[in-house]
Amino acid sequence: MARRKNVSGIARDALAFILEASRSTHPHEFAGLLRSDGRLISEVVLVPGTTSDEGSARMLLDMMPLDMSIVGSVHSHPVRDLRFSEADIDMFGAKGYYNIIVAYPYTDKDWVCYSPDGEKVSLPVVEADQ
């Protein structure tokens, strides 16, 4: 299982990027990896070769960077459903502790973070310079 990293929140700019990328790829899913600056989730890493459609997004494991600052994953659901699927929960542990799902219509209220076990994780949105 993925170990929990000491992350105190997600940078507002990183969340804004996630929401905009999800809108831009709609009705297909968006997927990426979450990178921490040691304090906050501050960036989204786009994995080469990622493909998606209306029902799923697939990241190629052999294209994922060897990067110790990766703390989780993000993907969108093009419907109004923030619940994870069995496929989502299977992927969560492989990508890190923090696993964000965003759902249509992709506003700042349409996201949730889960642990690899499927438990909701509190992840405050903060300004990166705080």
Where are these regions (language model features)?
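Conserved, mostly hydrophobic/aromatic
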Residues: 73
